[in-house]
Amino acid sequence: MTQPQRPSIYFNVHLVSDSTGETLNAIQRAACAQFENVQPLEHNYYLVRSERQLERVMKEIEAAPGVVWYTISDGALRGRLEAFCRERSIPTLPVLDPSIAMLSRHLGVAPNNRVAGQHALDEDYFERMEAINFTLAHDDGQNVESLIGADVILLGVSRTSKTPTCVYLANRKVRAGNIPLVPGVPLPDFMEKMGDKGPLVVGLKISAERLVQIRRQRLISLNQDEITEYADEEAVRDEITQANRLFQRNGWKTIDVSRRSVEETAAGILNMLHERWGHS
């Protein structure tokens, strides 16, 4: 007899980095892949290098407790984050520390604790950082007046992984921006007039069932028990229908993210860009 499938376990994981977050994301996903039916709810914080930035991060952690994985070189910031989490019994893991400590013992040399020390300061690095800065400045509909300078613009309703997909693309030196599709809120005027010479526009599609599941888990993580229109199945279906009609009307390319990881979605977008740019 087939054993019934165990229900999925959802938990918050906060990834705090003073650099691009690429290392943290790779390690976290590799670790979670070792567990069946485990669904981490990722909260990503990139380029955290000041007290003010850390303050915002800690407020987010307090609002949705879970586990905290971090790569922060600054001793004062590390101390604040660790003390904050310790006072609230929130587990923390400085993911690079074991590897750095082992190398230090083996080589007999103290680490220099450079921020983003894993990145060589070469042309490739600066191109990546330029893309990351562009992406962070054009996240969630910000600075739309300069969004025309993007390589790709992602459109999608709330909770379709627009931001993490853009950050992943930025780590591949792609200038990515995203605009949330909100019922009743029009897109910037230039979006429907760009034609083939503007940025690649990709609509992120998702099934209503999957989106309802994600949004309800999001409400649970924020300790909100009431099912609002945000997670109501009928309202979600209407929202998705409007988005799909918009994509079709403008002839924009689409990717269904219902069961895709961020990496898979980004890979599909990179393929579209390579076709457009004439790369193999």
From Swiss-Prot:
> Which top-level enzyme class is recorded in the Swiss-Prot or TrEMBL entry?
transferase
User: Mind listing the UniProt keywords for this protein, alphabetically?
Assistant: Kinase, Nucleotide-binding, Serine/threonine-protein kinase, Transferase
Tree of life domain: Bacteria
* Reactions accelerated catalytically: N(tele)-phospho-L-histidyl/L-threonyl-[pyruvate, phosphate dikinase] + ADP = N(tele)-phospho-L-histidyl/O-phospho-L-threonyl-[pyruvate, phosphate dikinase] + AMP + H(+); N(tele)-phospho-L-histidyl/O-phospho-L-threonyl-[pyruvate, phosphate dikinase] + phosphate + H(+) = N(tele)-phospho-L-histidyl/L-threonyl-[pyruvate, phosphate dikinase] + diphosphate
Function comment: Bifunctional serine/threonine kinase and phosphorylase involved in the regulation of the pyruvate, phosphate dikinase (PPDK) by catalyzing its phosphorylation/dephosphorylation.
Task: Provide the family line.
Answer: Belongs to the pyruvate, phosphate/water dikinase regulatory protein family. PDRP subfamily.
The name this protein carries in UniProt is Putative pyruvate, phosphate dikinase regulatory protein
Question: Could you confirm whether the keyword NADP appears in this record?
Answer: no
Which residues are noted in the entry as ADP-binding? G156, V157, S158, R159, T160, S161, K162, T163
Q: List the NCBIfam families.
A: PRK05339.1 (NF003742)
GO MF: ADP binding; ATP binding; phosphotransferase activity, phosphate group as acceptor; protein serine/threonine kinase activity
Q: What is its EC number?
A: 2.7.11.32, 2.7.4.27
From which organism does this entry originate?
Answer: Hyphomonas neptunium (strain ATCC 15444)
Pfam families the record matches: Kinase-PPPase
